[in-house]
Amino acid sequence: MPFPVPDPFVWDTSFQVFYFELDEKHRGIFQALFALGNDNNPSNLKLLYRVTANHFAEEEGFMQTANYGGYRSHKVLHEDFLAKLRSFKAPVPDKDVYFAKDWLVQHIKTIDFKYKNLL
């Protein structure tokens, strides 16, 4: 069963992976998506892509350093999501903003939670 998308769309402790740097980056993606949802313009779309790509690179670095077994499949999910974000054009349709919010929630709570205590 999918996890609910919070409304308002803000990070809370239910999303903690317990690695400070990664939690802060997740919080930043939430903030960027919230901004895009409230002011749907090219600048906020670029911000969302930038903070997401930066976070994915950092998270993947943690995984590689720890020889995390799920690294390759996790990286593919990141690449697919970044490709989807690159396909967006501002103003982004509401359904696509919701898709990104839902993807982030499900990804953190099902995929990222698998690396807790392993990095």
Curated annotation (Swiss-Prot):
- Which Pfam families does the entry link to? Hemerythrin
Q: Hey, which family's this protein in?
A: Belongs to the hemerythrin family.
Cross-referenced NCBIfam families, in alphabetical order? hemeryth_dom, Hemerythrin
Listed binding positions for Fe cation 1 are 26, 55, 59, 112
Q: What does this protein do?
A: Hemerythrin is a respiratory protein in blood cells of certain marine worms. The oxygen-binding site in each chain contains two iron atoms.
Q: Which GO terms describe its molecular function?
A: iron ion binding; oxygen carrier activity
- Binding residue positions for Fe cation 2: 59, 74, 78, 107, 112
Protein's recorded name? Hemerythrin subunit A
